[in-house]
């Protein structure tokens, strides 16, 4: 197939054509077990019937009406997010990048309104990932994504992840916000320690700064709770959500307390497609299923099974001996002889009918459907064992 798209993506050799649940079929009719979930997006698998019905029902009512108006689907989804989180208000957008952009802009505006222009510093973590806009890629602590776009926005300090002393040294009276991923995703599925997040909360309170938690990847059930912050006993001031919020239909959201959200008065921020009725209708139905006790229980039980099985595979093949993460967001950390070769393994896995991801050069990432069942898990692991065994035999140091 001729490619007419810009070359910023390195496309896989297969072209997906249809999918159902945790199975994908390409244009040649080959079947794949999907352990990637569209990079933690397809939380209910592919083409979930309830979401298809919700989209079909809404598309016969209202597609788009502009942000001059609110709509029933937007208010319904916002109410569910508020009722099941710390937040009082929700801003809808189209992606995780936009949700984080809104969070960072709100934090700076809130600080300016309350304390004046000198309180604008943002503290973020090295190796974090918060999006692809110029602002969010600058806040993300990975120069490989931002180095080509200088001059970058200023007033951003990066500290090592999980380094409490460095965080304490960085946060001060000029800090308007600290932004953290509860689990660093793109850099290797590395969970924050409880002490680190609790220290961040305490420092923000001490210095009148806001704690922003980026739950674009960890939120919407992936860790076995609706939001990952629930594991830590820490409550943020602002939270970003996207990816699984729409289960494949583009939507993002920024959640905030009422006092902080009040800084966003009419005209201060916006989004043409934010709160789109179709996106919110799908998101609302997805929310009901994701937040159901049986779904979250499945995440925890299947996650434990998958983690145990992956550890066994790693030890059997000698490729990895550590599996990080929570629930169904997991990362296999390649042992020293195989560091830097994660992409080779994911490519080999694809050839053998299993879709997995990388999280940096050294980690194999798994973010499957929250409805993953024993049959799909077993078949995916069977295929993966063949891949890992073959790779280890061909590359034994």
From Swiss-Prot:
Its cofactor is pyridoxal 5'-phosphate. Its main location: cytoplasm. Keywords: Amino-acid biosynthesis, Aminotransferase, Arginine biosynthesis, Cytoplasm, Pyridoxal phosphate, Transferase. N(2)-acetyl-L-ornithine binds at residues 132, 271. GO terms for biological process: L-arginine biosynthetic process. The modification N6-(pyridoxal phosphate)lysine is found at residue 243. It comes from the Bacteria. It is found in: Cytoplasm. GO terms for molecular function: identical protein binding; N2-acetyl-L-ornithine:2-oxoglutarate 5-aminotransferase activity; pyridoxal phosphate binding. One of its GO terms (cellular component) is cytoplasm. Pathway: Amino-acid biosynthesis; L-arginine biosynthesis; N(2)-acetyl-L-ornithine from L-glutamate: step 4/4. It catalyses: N(2)-acetyl-L-ornithine + 2-oxoglutarate = N-acetyl-L-glutamate 5-semialdehyde + L-glutamate. Its EC number is 2.6.1.11. Binds 1 pyridoxal phosphate per subunit. Pyridoxal 5'-phosphate binds at residues 129, 214-217, 272. Transmembrane segments: none annotated. May also have succinyldiaminopimelate aminotransferase activity, thus carrying out the corresponding step in lysine biosynthesis. Homodimer. Belongs to the class-III pyridoxal-phosphate-dependent aminotransferase family. ArgD subfamily. This is Acetylornithine aminotransferase. It comes from Neisseria meningitidis serogroup A / serotype 4A (strain DSM 15465 / Z2491).
């Amino acid at each position: 197939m001729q490619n007419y798209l810009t070359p910023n993506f390195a496309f896989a050799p297969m072209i997906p054509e249809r999918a159902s649940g945790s199975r994908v079929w390409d244009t040649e009719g080959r079947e794949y077990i999907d352990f990637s979930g569209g990079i933690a997006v397809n939380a209910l698998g592919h083409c979930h019937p309830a979401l298809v019905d919700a989209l079909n029902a809404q598309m016969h009512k209202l597609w788009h009406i502009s942000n001059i108006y609110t709509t029933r689907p937007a208010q319904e989804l916002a109410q569910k997010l508020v009722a099941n989180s710390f937040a009082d208000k929700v801003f809808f957008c189209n992606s995780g990048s936009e949700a984080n952009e809104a969070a960072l802009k709100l934090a700076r505006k809130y600080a300016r309104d309350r304390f004046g222009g000198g309180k604008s510093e943002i503290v973020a973590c090295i190796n974090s990932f918060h999006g692809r806009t110029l602002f969010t890629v600058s806040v993300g602590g990975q120069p490989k994504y931002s180095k080509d776009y200088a001059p970058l926005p200023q007033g951003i300090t990066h500290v090592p992840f999980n380094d409490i002393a460095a965080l304490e040294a960085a946060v001060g009276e000029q800090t308007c916000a600290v932004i953290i991923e509860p689990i660093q995703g793109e850099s290797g599925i590395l969970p924050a320690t409880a002490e680190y997040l609790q220290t961040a909360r305490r420092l923000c309170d001490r210095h009148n700064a806001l704690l922003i938690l980026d739950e674009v990847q960890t939120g919407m059930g992936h860790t076995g709770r609706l939001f990952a912050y629930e594991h830590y006993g820490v409550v943020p001031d602002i939270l970003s959500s996207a990816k699984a919020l729409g289960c494949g239909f583009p939507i993002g959201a920024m959640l905030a307390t009422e006092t902080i959200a009040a800084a966003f008065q009419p005209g201060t921020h916006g989004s043409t497609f934010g709160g789109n009725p179709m996106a919110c209708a799908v998101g609302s139905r997805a929310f009901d299923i994701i937040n159901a006790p049986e779904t979250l229980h499945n995440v925890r039980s299947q996650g434990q099974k998958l983690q145990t099985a992956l550890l066994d595979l790693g030890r059997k093949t000698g490729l990895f001996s550590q599996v990080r993460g929570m629930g169904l967001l997991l990362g296999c950390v390649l042992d020293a002889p195989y560091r830097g070769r994660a992409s080779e393994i994911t490519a080999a896995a694809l050839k053998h009918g299993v879709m997995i991801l990388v999280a940096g050069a050294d980690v194999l990432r798994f973010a499957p459907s929250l409805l993953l069942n024993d049959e799909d898990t077993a078949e995916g692991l069977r295929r993966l064992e063949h891949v890992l065994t073959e790779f280890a035999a061909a590359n034994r140091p």
